[in-house]
Amino acid sequence: MNVLDNFIKIKNSINSLSNTVKIIVVSKTFDINIINPIIKYGHNHFGENKVQEATIKWQPIISRYPSLKLHLIGNLQSNKAKDAVRLFNYIHSLSSEKLANILMKEENLINKKLKYFVQVNFSNLKERNGIKPNEATSFIKYCINDLKLEIIGLMCIPPLNENPNSYFFELKKIAIENNLHELSMGMSNDYLDALKNGSTYVRIGSKIFGERTNQ
């Protein structure tokens, strides 16, 4: 498994469509030794699902690579917010007023500003994380105006086994309505569709590292 070759191939294919799209290499469950070739190649954006795993993996090497940008792309529990603010630069799963308030307080405690994506949930499943589409605008305004969080864009994960294009289109529509310019959409199986719909951040893991044996 040559992860660097896989990454460069994907990077070149994406750059042929747009050279402004940021590729988040989703390195969850993989050891830092496997990720290292991509770091040494000069890539900066990496994504993780779990705060505890990410802290163990990245904390020892962050000081050696000051340009690294770490993205939390998984669901964030309130009791992990403190550690998340200290480690990550971006959070893609902002989805409740309670969490937003906690993150604001943690930012203020250490005088650090993160960049946030509001996660929009187009599924009717309650266990799916995210704000309902019809509640997105009021939530975005609350986070920006009341809490002074730096909301840069929106994120979504389309429902499984459905054509993602309509969901990507709808997410872009909500972003435009709220004057947000960044869209975190598209993973290994649908990033080309996401790019056609204006994605600015794609989250790619299995196309680079192969299928995970554990989640």
Which residues are covered by each model-predicted region?
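Short, basic/aromatic-enriched C-terminal tail that caps enzymatic domains
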Residues: 195-215
